[in-house]
């Protein structure tokens, strides 16, 4: 079973932050230390802030636990939703999978500054970063999708023992019509996004398909 806590996961400190520190982090960074009178009313409780933030296009966070272990960290922003899956490797928490969903047309925003939502307020899977770790080789695959059926792919391999690395970049054609998914309906309606195996084309995680541009 999943459990949601509206708390910040601190990768540097390798821990889930307290409610007080989570809210202070939102005040300091997101609100630039200047919350207004209305915001202050909700900044005394992390879940109440999440409810307010969802309805008012503000930033909030949540750490997802599965069977009492840390499973994922979600950052909700007005224009994007970031999902970082969490695992343990050699005694440290790592992010083996990172998903970025756009809530608005990023190209239109950077071109004109206008906020243009997708049809039905759907989300668009804009990026995937998939990492695998072994003592001999670490692999990172990053895919950035565009709305015009193109994707930028970066394949990186590092060899810790030899202290060597190599990277390959390429542009590929891809049918991004499959990248759309419904938007959350409530402040706590995010668990369905964790089911990436059913939400996302399996080919996006297939190194052979990516290498041959067969997407």
What is each residue range found by the language model?
Residues 89-144:
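An exposed acidic His-Trp-rich patch
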Residues 61-68, 72:
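Conserved beta-hairpin
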Residues 56-63, 80-86, 111-114, 141:
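A structural detector for short beta-strand units
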Residues 74-79, 84, 95-103, 130, ...:
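Beta-turn initiation residues at beta-strand->coil junctions
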Residues 65, 86-89, 118, 145-146, ...:
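Conserved anchor residues at repeat-unit boundaries in beta-strand-based tandem repeats, strongest
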Residues 82-85, 105-112, 164-168:
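A short, polar/proline- and glycine-enriched secondary-structure boundary/capping micro-motif
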Residues 1-49, 120-215:
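Long terminal segments
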């Amino acid at each position: 079973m999943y459990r949601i806590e509206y708390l910040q996961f601190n990768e540097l400190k390798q821990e889930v932050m307290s409610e007080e520190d989570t809210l202070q982090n939102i005040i300091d960074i997101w609100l630039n230390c200047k919350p207004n009178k209305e915001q202050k009313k909700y900044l005394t409780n992390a879940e109440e802030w999440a409810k307010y933030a969802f309805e008012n296009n503000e930033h909030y966070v949540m750490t997802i636990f599965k069977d009492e272990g840390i499973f994922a960290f979600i950052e909700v922003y007005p224009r994007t939703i970031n999902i970082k899956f969490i695992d343990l490797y050699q005694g440290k928490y790592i992010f083996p999978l990172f998903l970025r969903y756009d809530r608005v047309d990023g190209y239109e925003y950077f071109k004109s500054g206008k906020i243009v939502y997708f049809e039905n307020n759907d989300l668009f899977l804009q990026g995937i970063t998939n990492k695998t770790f072994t003592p001999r080789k670490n692999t990172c695959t990053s895919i950035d999708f565009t709305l015009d059926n193109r994707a930028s792919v970066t394949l990186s391999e590092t060899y810790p023992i030899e202290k060597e690395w190599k990277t390959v970049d390429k542009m590929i054609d891809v049918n991004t019509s499959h990248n759309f998914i419904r938007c959350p309906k409530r402040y706590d309606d995010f668990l369905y996004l964790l089911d990436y195996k059913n939400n996302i084309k399996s080919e996006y995680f297939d190194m052979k398909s990516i290498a041959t541009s067969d997407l």
